[in-house]
């Protein structure tokens, strides 16, 4: 029993990435950055192409990252339960959960940049 409680405690580390993504999304939403030169806010090469790119990025990135974090949090919870019931070692479970978290984070940046580029081409009505 004590081993299982320790395993559950270790698996809580899989929630770090989703919680940080939600936190950063909330901070970006509450404190939008209008100055591109400040190097704050959603700051990628695509968002720095022009002031219009920057403004749109600051508008959409918070909502995308909050939504991504919520989905990732739910996914990590289900994954942890499945891996715990399957008796997968904690090391493997942390590796799998961390890998999924990092992949989702990279995907969030990629998706946001695609939305910015589509909007600037006039293909995105949102």
Language-model segments: what does each one mean?
Residues 10-13, 34, 38-40, 65-67:
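A loop-to-helix transmembrane entry motif
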Residues 25-31, 48, 52, 83-90:
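Membrane-targeting and insertion segments and their boundary/processing signals
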Residues 47-66:
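Membrane interfacial helix-start motif at the N-side
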Residues 42-46:
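A short, exposed loop/beta-hairpin motif centered on an aromatic-Gly-Thr core
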Residues 88-126:
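Alpha-helical transmembrane segments and their immediate juxtamembrane interface regions
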Residues 14-25, 69-72, 76-80, 101-112:
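Helical transmembrane-bundle signal
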Residues 1-17, 75-84, 88, 93-99:
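Long, highly hydrophobic alpha-helical transmembrane signal-anchor segments
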Residues 23-41, 111-115:
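Membrane-water interface of transmembrane alpha-helices
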């Amino acid at each position: 029993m004590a081993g299982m409680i320790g395993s559950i405690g270790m698996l809580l580390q899989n929630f770090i990435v989703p919680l940080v993504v939600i936190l950063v999304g909330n901070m970006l939403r509450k404190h939008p950055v209008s100055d591109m030169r400040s190097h704050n806010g959603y700051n990628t090469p695509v968002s720095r192409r022009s002031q219009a790119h920057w403004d749109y990025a600051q508008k959409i990135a918070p909502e995308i990252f909050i939504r991504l974090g919520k989905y990732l949090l739910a996914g990590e919870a289900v994954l942890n339960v499945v891996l715990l019931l399957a008796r997968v070692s904690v090391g493997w479970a942390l590796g799998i959960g961390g890998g999924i978290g990092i992949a989702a984070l990279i995907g969030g940046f990629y998706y946001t940049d695609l939305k910015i580029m589509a909007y600037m081409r006039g293909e995105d009505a949102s």
